[in-house]
Every structure is written in C-alpha cells, then in structure tokens.
Amino acid sequence: RADEFLAAVLEDLAETQTDGGRIAVHGELSPIEVSARDATTLGILVGELVTNALKYAFPDARSGTITVTLAPDDEDVPMLRVKDDGVGMREGDDATESGLGSVIVKQLSGQFGGEPHYAPADGGGLEVRIRLPELGRTRTTTKDDIL
C-alpha cells in the first residue's frame, strides 16, 4: 500500500535530512493499493518534493514543517500534496521552469497522468498539488517505460 511505503520514506527523510529535527516532516496518508513499481515511483516523487522543500523553504537555520498528504479528492482520484510553512517562492520565481528537480517531478507525475501545480500555501510557504489519476491502476509496460 502507498501509505505504508510513503510512511517509511518520510521517516527516513526525517531521520537523515531534517538537520536534527529543526524541520518536522508529517504524513497524512490514506491507504491506497498500488503495485510495487508504482510505490517506488511515488516514493521517488515524494522524496524529490520533500528534498526540494528542505533545500529551499528553510534558509538560515529556520525551523518549520513539511506535510505530505495522499488522499482521494472529491472525484475519488488520488491527490498528492506537499506543503511547507517556509519562506515560499519569491515574486517572479517559477518552480516549473527548468531546474532538474522540477523536471524530475514533472516526469514522475506524468507517469501517473498528473502534472504538478505550485501555489502559495495558506499561512505562508509553498504547496505542490499533483492529481494522480493513474495511481493504483494496473498498467502494462510499454517501450516508453523502459530506459
């Protein structure tokens, strides 16, 4: 299940990358059945988003919180949200531009039929929302899936 796998990913990130607990990482994860392949891809996606938040949202030893939510939306489509209460994006910045992290997030999201949307979070910080309509659906491997 996605929730069990992501809980382990978040625990690992919290233990190894949060600068001694200065930044808290929380998960609000619904049980969604997924294949091992989808769980792995989702774990890489979440890892990239959380790592980006750790890298950019909390400069100058600022403390804060990152919350990862995976739950069905109103149409029962899995929705991934990664929200931080950090400094947010500077005016004129575009998280979707060209950084390697953004490219990775876009590519991994696309594997689930999704696209990342970046917006200011309520109360400050940044929230990334990705609707994942293909998560948990059985897919056949195509030549495009093979590196």
List PLM regions with ranges:
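Glycine-rich ATP-binding loops of the HATPase_c
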Residues: 113-120
